Structures are given as C-alpha cells and as structure tokens.
Amino acid sequence: ILLLAAGVTTSTAQCKFRNTAFKSGEYLSYNLYFNWKFVWVKVGNASMSTVESKYHGKPAYRSSLITRSSANADKFFVMRDTLLCYNSLQMEPLYFRKGAREGDRYTVDEAFFSYPGGKTHLKQHQQKNNGTHVWHESKPTECTFDMLSIFLRARSFNPEGWKKGNRIHFPITDGTKVIPAVLEYKGKTTVKADNGHKYRCLQLSYMEKENGKYKEIVRFYVTDDANHVP
C-alpha cells in the first residue's frame, strides 16, 4: 500500500514512525474466549500495558501483553504467555521477549535489535523446552518487527482511503527465524464488547507466510478513531 510505504521500507532511517495513537500509562484488559461447537466459552483473561521507560539508559516505550487461562480451562490446556517489547520513542523495535507456557511446555523467544551505521542488526535467542539455547545473528535489509512492535506501530497507521483487501507487507521475527508477514484490511464493522457497548471498528487480519501461502494467525479489531484501541 503506497499510503503506508513510509512506515515499512528498506531504509533504516524510515524504520522510525510517529506515534499518534497511545500515551504512556495505557492499560487494557480483555476476556479470552474459545469457540467450542459454535458456542463461545470464556477460558481466561489478558492484559496489555504501555508505559514510557528506559532501555539501555535511553527513553523508550515498554509494552507487555499477558495472557492467562482460567482454572477451569487449565484442566484441559494450560496457557501462560507473557510478551514484552521495548521500542524507541520513534517506534523503532529494540527488544522482544516471549515466555510461553503452553500445555506442559515452556519456551522463551527473544529478539535484540540495533542499528549500527544506520543498518539493522538482529540477534535472536531461543530457550527450548529441554533447556538448550540457540542463538542466531543476521543483518536484515528491511525494517524488521516483532509481534508487539508491529501491533503498536499499526495503531498509528492512517486508514483514510483504505479499501478491503489492502495489504501491508513486513518481515516478522521471533527467537528463531524471520518470515514474511502481512496485515490485511478487512473493512469496518461494529463490535459489541463485554461491557455492553458497541464500537465501530476497523477489522484487520494478521497473516504469516507458510509453505508459500499466507495463513491467518489472528484477526483483530481496533476502534475507528485516532487512538485505534484494540
């Protein structure tokens, strides 16, 4: 999408982006549901917070997303995920960590971003369930993001003029790999929240490339206003 080309390009200088959507101190909470035989069943909760902090002594945004399955859901499948990221105040990714306990497995994925000489340098780390560690370093030619960083940046995208099917392409990383990913605009819709309020929202699909095809990982909704609250 030409509209967003300045946000995700090969020039590291343009990895910077202006935040227009959130302020330090934002806290959001959610209920988690699972669709079981066409019935939505509450299985846990999630919370997301963003504050201005410091990373290696420099001002940065610190954002975390914590998901927890309920005691009843734990009888079938335990989920304890904690995602953390740091971004510069110009929205450049600096650090990402995902600690995931899913079932009887626990893994840690990390990504460290730096920009020596205006070039992107990426260091990845994974701690596997058996306790072994894997490290990898690379120099991507494009602005590269983690799951939380691209989510924060997307909130400041200007959707004016978007049409259904418009896509934003970008590389995404975790602790082991860098893969092509896409945000696809699905149009506007009205969402009724648990508090009974209805919100006019933009509908977006996050997809990752798998076996040559893009597969939807998650579909999310953000308010159709300047804050784009998820």
Where are these regions (language model features)?
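Bacterial Sec-dependent N-terminal signal peptides
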Residues: 1-15
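N-terminal cleavable signal peptides for secretion/export
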Residues: 12-82, 99-108, 165-166, 170-176
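Short, hydrophobic/aromatic-rich segments at coil-to-beta transitions
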Residues: 22-29, 57-64, 89-97, 120-121, ...
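Solvent-exposed helix/loop surface patches that form functional interfaces
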Residues: 23-25, 106-199
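Short beta-turn/strand-loop junction motif enriched in small, turn-promoting residues
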Residues: 35-37, 70-72, 188-191, 207-209
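Hydrophobic/aromatic beta-strand elements that line small-molecule binding cavities or substrate pockets
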Residues: 46-52, 81-86, 109-113, 183, ...
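Hydrophobic alpha-helical segments and helix pairs
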Residues: 77-129
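Gly/Pro-enriched, hydrophobic low-complexity segments
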Residues: 78-80, 84-89, 202-230
